[in-house]
């Protein structure tokens, strides 16, 4: 089963398309990294999935329900937004009471126990908590709904490294204990590489890359060799992106999983998720979806890298 399916999905604001012709299937039981530059459509896609806005074109199905935002669909979803929406003037106890009354599957015992472990007193107002504590409170309220799908829209953007680590530790515990599927939008590639096993890259409102992380890494490599031979080598390969220096060039290539021979005088290296992401971000015309790589670009190499 897929937790999210989009078919020709689009959202237009006036004459501007925030998301266009988005077709995507996100399988159950995964931690999904949703990546893209600012304005790529990440938040729009997530808002469509949780029913906060309606599509202009196409359809989106969430947990088998074709009506995002309906009571049955929302029963299985928990959403934590970037701005950590909380009632800042309410105490923690009042927040728990309110959330319990609004959600029929809310696990009060879990929420109280989790906040106790975090050392967050029930008498304190939400607005008096630190940024990390507010993020943990929002996450606790979301997980206490016992969702099948947890949607996180850059919830760690304002957190320090320790708070981000603690936040993700809570998420990973929920995955291990309850089998929650997670869709996580973030710009912090290093964190995503540690936790994600499925990857989606949006560019200009459309899906550019999608697939299992292991499969994507297996069918991409970095070739390093003489800069003078880069063009000749690239003509025989599916090159996504080239970085060229005075002496050496680095070609990120797609192999489609085949054991393509390494050209003479070149060395092959495994690719990291960060390298793959940056290469495709620099090549809006290239795609790892079915079909050929559609663009190749040469960029001067930063010798400090």
What are these regions (language model features)?
Residues 50:
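Helix-to-loop junction immediately C-terminal to a conserved catalytic motif
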Residues 58-73:
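Conserved ABC transporter NBD signature motif
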Residues 35-37:
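The feature captures the beta-strand-to-loop junction immediately N-terminal to the Walker
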Residues 150-154, 159:
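Catalytic Walker B motif of ABC-type/P-loop ATPase nucleotide-binding domains
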Residues 81-137:
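ABC-family P-loop ATPase nucleotide-binding domains
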